[in-house]
């Protein structure tokens, strides 16, 4: 499960932190960082890396819940940003929708707390707030 994967990752992180054989340049630690579930959710670091090459104005960052809640408004924002004519996309049915077990409340709280400082940095960078903790 997702919860099991996160718990296993936290154990690996603790082993890496507490074992003197693991240094930051250790390949196992670096591989962990590359394949980390948690690290991939720290969007601010990835966006900052891209902003070394592109200006802030060259990014349009929108939450997917806006796409799900109001597809026409969402697409209008995208078309306006791209300076292209607004048009209606006919086939907007969601494809390959999976079934997911509801996230355990304690795991959700952990994730909200874990990502809070990173998301605050993101919101400050983007000058925009997303309601991810609700």
What are these regions, as identified by a protein language model?
Residues 1-66, 70-73, 77:
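PAPS-dependent sulfotransferase catalytic domain
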